[in-house]
Amino acid sequence: MKKLVLIGLAFLITTSLSILYGQKTVVRYAPDDDGTVYTSVEAALKAGKAVYRLKLAKLANRDSLPEELFQLTELRELTVKGCRLCRLNQNIGKLTKLQYLNLDHNKLLRLPESIGRLSDLRTLVISRNILEELPESIGSLRQLATIDAWGNPLYVLPHSIGELRKTLRVLDLRQIPLTKWEYEAMEQLLPETDILFTDICECENRRDHD
C-alpha cells in the first residue's frame, strides 16, 4: 500500500488535494446542465429547472441546513463551507444523487446515519469540524473514492470503513489524534488506499495520558 507521511509539507499537500477534488473541470450531469453553481437555496428553488450544484457560503442565523434545501433532489454537488454548521439534518439522506459533499470548516459534532443513503457519493469533505467519530453507515457508500477528514478530533473510525476497500483511493487523516496502532489497523482494512497522515508523536502521547 502507498502511504504518505506528511509533516509540514504544505505545498505538497495543497497540490495533491487540489488535483483530487479541487479541480476546475466542470462535469456535465445531464443534457440540460449548463454548469450553473447556485449560491443560495432561494435562487435554486426559483430556477424552474433541475439544479445540480449548490454552494453556500453563509447560513443567516442558522446552525443547520434549511429544510427547503432537501427539495433539490437532483443535486450532484453540495458545498456548505465555513458556515458554522453545528448539525447535519437527517434529511441529507434524501439527496441520493449527490456525488460531491463538502462540509469543510464548520462545527459539526457528528454525521447522521442517513448519510449512508448517498449511494452515488464519490467525494466527502468533512475537514476542520469537531467530529469525534464517523457513522457506521459510511461503509454503505460503495462509490466513495475520497474522504477528507483532516483536522478533526477523531478518536475512532468505524470498522465498516473496510467495506470501501475496493473504491476508496484517498483517506486524509492529517492532524487527527489516532495512535500508531490505529493507523496500522487502517492499513489492514484499506490496503489499496493512500492514507495521508501526520506522523507526530504528540498525537499518540496525548492519547496515552487521557
Question: Model-predicted segments: where are they?
Answer:
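Leucine-rich solenoid repeat scaffolds
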Residues: Y155-D210
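Sec-dependent signal peptide cleavage junction
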Residues: I19-L45, I200-D210
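Leucine-rich repeat
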Residues: G48, F70-E74, G93-K97, G116-L121, ...
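Conserved hydrophobic beta-strand positions in leucine-rich repeat
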Residues: Y52-A57, L78-V80, Q99-L103, L121-I126, ...
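Bacterial Sec-dependent N-terminal signal peptides
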Residues: M1-V27
